[in-house]
A protein has these predicted regions:
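Extended, domain-scale alpha-helical bundle/helix-rich regions
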Residues: 1-62, 67, 71
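Conserved functional hotspot residues or short segments at active or partner-binding sites
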Residues: 1-8, 338-502
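Polar, glycine-rich mid-to-C-terminal structural blocks
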Residues: 274, 286, 291-364
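A generic structural motif
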Residues: 68, 133-137, 337
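Conserved phosphate-chemistry cores used by DNA topoisomerases
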Residues: 13-19, 248-252, 300, 333, ...
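Conserved catalytic motifs of ABC-family nucleotide-binding domains
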Residues: 95
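Amphipathic, well-packed alpha-helical segments that form the structural scaffold of globular domains
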Residues: 4, 8, 30-34, 38, ...
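Cleft-lining beta-strand/loop regions that shape enzyme active-site pockets
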Residues: 18-23, 43-60, 76-81, 85-87, ...
Length: 503
């Protein structure tokens, strides 16, 4: 009933506004055309383009709150970013209802039962100020004027931790995306942020380092190249070939390394694009042990261009202003290849030490997507010097022995096979109870263990975190999540094995 009510409200919102209806039909049509070329060519209305770029940026111009439309059509505030304009106003609180919006031009916009995308369009508009009317839980109405400000994107923050297991210290850095500053607002870049975390972790006396790229869907290719260069002295990182063009070698832009010790990279089926670039490059150099399950298999390059007949790509400087009303297109320009000439396209990166993962049962990879571009190779002379081969066979044997004695991974392997069977069965039960059981098997997960090892921050971060209650709470949650992760534990043990074997 709730789902039906949501659909009914959405359709009613669209149909009540002719312009919104025209936009909805136009968006569907243009998205369908774009998707017929390859999975990553996509039409973006202006607000979707902004949201996409924001997801890959460390800082954005925002008001600093998120909304949710309830089943009855009311729009509620569900979270507020500390330090943002909404937070600093002191007049907007979680669970407040958003009643109306007044733009800088004086246009009043009713909020209840707003059509999908209508509010997104308002908040992503280049206009830097709005007046909101909110209603608190006691019924009080408050008018709040907000001015956009630079707000940190918490989801893209790089955080480094020390993992202590059996008296050995391993550095751990999770990288959620290859973000960068897209415009004049600047902000941090992921390669630079990772380098800073490594410096702090080295001061803690780490003996090895884990870079977690699981669920990292990619982002800025230049950042991926710079990140790879942190771990090698100099040399080529990837080969790129645009449609009809020659193959170009892209190299590490800086000589020297930030970290030259034992390195492991965690990947899974949702590690894509730039993540695969980094994992593949460091694998080809024998620089890192790749741990986990096969990656997604995307090795294509995209760029976002305006649908504006006055725009000339050949004369672009990056400072042009565009007609945003026509939208934008994210278009595939070419393919990325490994320095060996091989490709991760469709194939993904094969881990050196494989760990079972339920994500393998979903079969959601580049290969499964309609119109995915084929995999091929390129012939180009590339000169690079690999490090000595890693003791992969010994690492695989030791890891396999541990997995065979691990109740968690034994249960996980069993569940993986069961889930694969259920997923392969295309017969969906229509009886409610049978469907519920079928769905539970599809979405089943193994309960994480708890407190597998000690996790703590570098001393520099600890002092800063203690100054902020919100930061302290979020940090405690992250530490707990890491310490309960059996994949991180096994990866840390593999790093300990590597250190022992190389001694």
């Amino acid at each position: 009933k709730q789902l039906a009510a949501n659909y009914k409200r959405s359709f009613a919102g669209i149909l009540s506004d002719q312009k919104e209806l025209n936009n909805a039909i136009s968006d569907i049509y243009l998205k369908s055309i774009a998707a017929s070329y390859d999975p990553h060519t996509e039409f973006f209305p202006a607000e979707e383009k902004d949201a996409f770029e924001e997801s890959l940026s460390s800082n954005n111009m925002k008001f600093g709150f998120t909304l949710n439309q309830a089943n009855d059509g009311d729009v509620e505030v569900v979270s507020i970013v500390p330090g943002s304009p909404a937070w600093n106003s002191g007049s907007i609180h979680v669970n407040d209802k958003l009643v109306s919006i007044k733009t800088a031009g004086g246009r009043e916009i009713p909020v209840k039962n707003a059509a999908p995308g209508q509010l997104d369009s308002v908040f992503s508009d280049p206009s830097q100020s709005l007046e909101l009317t909110v209603q608190s839980s006691d019924g009080k109405l408050t008018a709040v004027k907000l001015q956009k400000a630079l707000v940190s994107n918490e989801e893209n923050f790089v955080k480094g931790y020390v993992i202590e297991l059996e008296g050995k210290k391993t550095g751990y850095i999770a990288l959620p995306s290859f973000y960068s500053g897209w415009d004049e607002n600047g902000g941090g870049s992921c390669a630079n942020d990772v380098a800073k975390e490594i410096v702090k972790l080295k001061k803690e006396g780490i003996e090895s380092l884990l870079l977690d790229l699981r669920y990292n869907g990619g982002g800025n290719v230049e950042e991926a190249i710079e990140l790879s260069g942190i771990f090698i002295d100099a040399g080529p990182i990837l080969l790129a070939k645009e449609t009809g063009g020659k193959t170009t070698t892209l190299k590490d832009p800086s000589r020297g390394t930030i970290y030259d010790g034992p390195l492991g990279i965690l990947i899974n089926g949702q590690s894509a694009s730039a993540s695969e670039l980094v994992a593949g490059a460091l694998q080809d150099y024998n620089r890192a042990v790749i741990i986990g399950s096969n990656s997604f298999g995307k090795a294509t390059m995209q760029s976002i261009l305006p649908i504006d007949t006055t725009f000339d790509l050949n004369k672009a400087t990056g400072k042009e202003t565009f007609n945003r009303q026509n939208g934008f297109v994210k278009i595939t320009l070419g393919k990325i290849y490994r320095i060996t000439g091989g490709s991760n396209q469709l194939n993904g990166v094969t881990p050196d030490v494989k760990l079972p993962d339920l994500i393998e049962a979903t079969d959601y990879t580049e290969r499964s997507l309609p119109y995915a571009l084929p995999s091929d190779t390129v012939m180009k002379k590339v000169f690079y010097t690999t490090l000595k081969p890693l003791p992969l066979q010994q690492l695989q044997q030791r890891s396999s022995q541990r997995l065979a004695g691990s109740e968690y991974f034994k249960d996980l392997s069993k569940q993986l096979q069961e889930t694969k069977k259920v997923t392969a069965d295309n017969n969906v039960p229509l009886q409610w109870e049978a469907y519920r059981q079928w769905r539970e098997k599809q979405t089943a997960h193994i309960q994480n263990k708890k407190n597998l090892f000690k996790v703590y921050n570098a001393a520099f971060d600890t002092k800063l975190i203690e100054l902020n209650d919100f930061e302290r709470e979020q940090n405690a949650i992250l530490q707990k999540t890491i310490s309960n992760d059996a994949f991180v534990e096994e990866a840390a043990r593999i790093m300990m094995d590597l250190k022992t074997i190389n001694q």
